[in-house]
A protein has these predicted regions:
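Active-site and adjacent substrate-binding regions of carbohydrate-active enzymes
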Residues: 1-529, 534-556
Length: 556
């Protein structure tokens, strides 16, 4: 297997608005990331993925881009970005940036010109249709129709919010504009891109109505606007024109790609270095996009999804491993549900957090840690829908009410799933607002910040933060690299349902076993003899696992 830096790297996703504010306006900024680079270096991070920082009206927190060549003033200046790239490079930390190429903001100059003049060259950059009636009954990802009125008998298409008009990838001129943007940022010094919602760029039969899949009379945009026939030509062209250098790391948010087609996306000649798999992250939802349709699941179900993903990816290319991101709730609350540690039970929180950390660092693929995950951050406590910022959360609340749930039930659904759970300000210290800002934070802080803050955990050698540091060191250790990074994943079949057990097997036959008890009861195990690499308890038995115990052993 080809060896390359991004396969061996551990990444850290930064949601800049919530990471560190340096000027007291309540919004995190690029200088805040720069200030905390030593913290990331100490953690063992090789690259950071920074969520959008471009000029934006912030209807969708930066995923509505108004200018791909600039920096939003709330985040700083281009000089700040240049300095961040320079200082990160000096510390051996590469920078990956979010690239949103399915849509722009409705405030982008292209769209404004297209609206102002139907004969503008930019009209073809978007999907405009002349029609007296709504062109089709397709539902957007954020609810309601994908079609929005743009003057008399004219409509434009939006996969997400109406403030995010979709780009028309059928236009060669538009595609060349997008490739110029990628080349600009690579010349700036970024080491790669995370491509947002990239499998939505091709639409088929977008003007045709279909049998509704819900009482709103609409059908999901996934039917005609996700991973459609013809997308491969677009992705291949982008790859050939911009991304042929194997040193450039590319990771795609690529929903809708079946496992049997993964080699086209991440194989030796694939379009991207890796893709995110949503199957196990969305285990708590039934098919569709309604958060009130919560799915019952067991740890047996989780294991099936995890190992199906791992086994499918390892035969076709390379994967991106994560448990949390800016679009997900916190993993504590998702995977442990009602068993998640009470806020004042810090020992239980350590056990559960270290169990999840061991799973994350034991799997095959490039590891992504989301900000605050290394501290054991949990979902927040939102007391009303007014406390939320996320537009999707507000739409999901409305959907639940329309489906007949009362306000308390609807709030419970969005409390469980809201993207704002992972977007709350990072807790640096026990000071006001967790040391995130000297002003009023743009989103409320989690009320447990003093108990789990980074400063407190840095001073405690037995903290979850130190456990993460140690795991990252173990993963990168030369003695473990061939097993833990490049080795095959093989499930240990005789493990009990609530025990996730697997081996990482190097080409030379060396093995590392990982055993994780996801339950609050002692469970039977059959751990191999060997060197204990990590253990979240002070003792180890080969035949049993304590509640939430996680053990990694290099087999003899």
């Amino acid at each position: 297997m080809k060896r390359i830096w991004w396969k061996e790297a551990v990444g850290y996703q930064i949601y800049p608005k919530s990471f560190k504010d340096t000027n007291g306006d309540g919004i995190g900024d690029l200088k805040g990331i720069l200030e905390k680079l030593p913290y990331l270096k100490e953690l063992g991070i090789d690259f950071i993925w920074i969520c959008p920082f471009y000029p934006s009206p912030m209807k969708d927190n930066g995923y509505d881009v108004a200018d791909y060549y600039g920096i939003d003033p709330c985040f700083g200046t281009m000089e700040d970005m240049d300095l961040l790239l320079k200082k990160a490079g000096e510390l051996g930390i590469r920078v990956i940036i979010d690239m949103v190429l399915n849509h722009t903001s409705d405030q982008h100059a292209w769209f404004r010109e297209a609206l102002k003049d139907p004969n503008s060259e930019y009209r073809d950059y978007y999907m405009f249709v002349q029609s007296k009636e709504r062109p089709s009954n397709t539902r957007s990802c954020f609810g309601g129709s994908v079609w929005e009125k743009a003057g008399e008998d004219c409509w434009y298409y939006h996969t997400f919010d109406k403030s995010q008009p979709d780009l028309n990838w059928e236009s060669q001129k538009l595609r060349e504009e997008l490739y110029n943007i990628l080349n600009y940022w690579m010349e700036k010094g970024v080491s790669g891109f995370r491509f947002d919602a990239i499998t939505y760029i091709k639409k088929v039969n977008s003007l045709v109505s279909h049998e509704p899949d819900n009482t709103d009379g609409l059908i999901s945009v996934e039917t005609t606007g996700q991973n459609q026939e013809g997308i491969r030509e677009f992705l291949q062209e982008m790859n050939h024109k911009c991304l042929r250098d194997p040193e450039i790391m590319t990771v795609a948010e690529a929903p809708g790609v079946p496992y049997e087609n993964l080699s086209e996306f991440i194989g030796e000649d694939g379009y991207f270095s890796m893709v995110f798999d949503f199957s196990y992250a969305d285990i708590d939802l039934l098919p569709g996009s309604n958060w009130y349709n919560q799915a019952p699941w067991t740890f047996g179900d989780l294991k099936k999804l995890l190992f199906r993903s791992q086994c499918s990816v390892q035969t076709q290319g390379w994967g991106a491993i994560y448990l949390e991101n800016h679009d997900q709730s916190r993993s504590f609350n998702k995977y442990f549900r009602e068993k998640a540690a009470a806020r004042d039970d810090l020992h239980l929180r350590f056990l559960q957090g270290s169990a999840l950390a061991t799973l994350l660092m034991g799997l095959r693929g490039t590891v992504f840690v989301y900000q605050g995950e290394e501290l054991g951050s949990e979902n927040g406590k939102f007391n009303s829908i007014e406390e939320y910022d996320d537009l999707n959360t507000k739409d999901q609340y409305r959907r639940a009410l329309c489906a007949g749930y009362d306000e308390a039930q609807s709030l419970k659904f969005v409390n469980d799933r809201s993207r704002d759970n992972s977007r709350m300000p990072f807790p640096w210290t026990a000071e006001a607002n967790g040391g995130f800002t000297s002003g009023m934070p743009w989103l409320k802080c989690n009320d447990d910040y003093a108990a789990i803050c980074a400063k407190k955990q840095e001073q405690d050698k037995d903290s979850l933060l130190h456990y993460y540091r140690n795991l990252i060191r173990i993963r990168k250790d030369e003695a473990n690299r061939e097993s833990l990074i490049y080795g095959e994943v093989r499930e240990i079949q005789n493990a009990l349902e609530s025990v996730i057990a697997f081996e990482r097997i190097a080409e030379n036959g060396e093995k590392i076993q990982i055993w994780i008890n996801m339950s609050d009861e002692t469970r039977q195990a059959d751990i191999a003899e060997g060197e204990i690499l990590c253990n979240n308890y002070s003792e180890t038995s080969q035949k049993s696992l304590n509640p939430y115990q996680a053990v990694m052993v290099r087999c003899r």
